[in-house]
């Protein structure tokens, strides 16, 4: 199956692909792109087609550094199937060339891909998944991994996220899986009749 060269996309074209992609989130959405634009960054949407269908895309922003050089950043990485070895390779090459043609000095990505499964205490789950191959593939493209740091860093997105698997679980089972302090906080909120209401943009 033939892959295209890297294409520049309109905001609408990118959003149509990104809005249904499993790795999509606010940080790589068109709304994030608009936020970067308001802060003076240049905003690009680029992608690759396979046999005429969009197969990979990314929000790519850049800002001027010293002289004519620019810093490029793909917030939360590329939207593609990282298990498809051909796609990450083609996307990396295309984006690197795109940045180079625009005096890019540095290109940063922080893919929205889970690296390894841990339990609620931060311990590695025995027989859990590990996506080291994705790290290896990106390093083979020329990226340098910055290590598995902990804590908060204003220059980087959070590395650790807590995710609760909701599949095939009733309310009580889910509740019991919470940390004891979290269960206490929920019960306290219920006693104080604190309620969450879902609201649209018009109520914000």
Which residues make up each language-model segment?
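Acyltransferase donor/substrate-recognition loop-hinge adjacent to the catalytic core
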Residues: 2-9, 56, 131-204
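N-terminal charged segments
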Residues: 6-51, 56
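Short alpha-helical segments and helix-capping/turn motifs at coil-helix boundaries
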Residues: 30-31, 90-95, 145-148
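Conserved donor-binding loop and adjoining core beta-sheet/short helix segment
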Residues: 35-127
């Amino acid at each position: 199956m033939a892959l295209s060269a890297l294409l520049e996309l309109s905001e609408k074209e990118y959003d149509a692909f990104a809005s249904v992609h499993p790795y999509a989130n606010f940080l790589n959405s068109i709304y994030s792109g608009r936020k970067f634009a308001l802060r003076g960054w240049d905003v690009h949407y680029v992608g690759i087609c396979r046999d005429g269908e969009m197969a990979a895309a990314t929000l790519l922003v850049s800002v001027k550094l010293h002289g004519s050089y620019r810093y490029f950043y793909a917030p939360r990485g590329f939207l593609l199937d990282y298990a498809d070895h051909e796609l990450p390779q083609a996307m990396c090459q295309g984006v690197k060339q795109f940045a180079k043609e625009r005096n890019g000095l540095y290109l940063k990505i922080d893919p929205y891909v889970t690296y390894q499964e841990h339990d609620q205490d931060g311990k590695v789950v025995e027989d859990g998944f590990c996506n080291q191959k994705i790290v290896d593939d990106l390093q083979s493209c020329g990226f340098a991994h910055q290590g598995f740091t902990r804590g908060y860093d204003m220059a980087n997105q959070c590395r650790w996220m807590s995710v609760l698997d909701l599949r095939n679980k009733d309310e009580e089972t889910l509740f019991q899986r919470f940390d004891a302090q979290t269960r206490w906080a929920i019960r306290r909120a219920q006693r104080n009749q604190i309620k969450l209401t879902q609201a649209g943009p018009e109520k914000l």
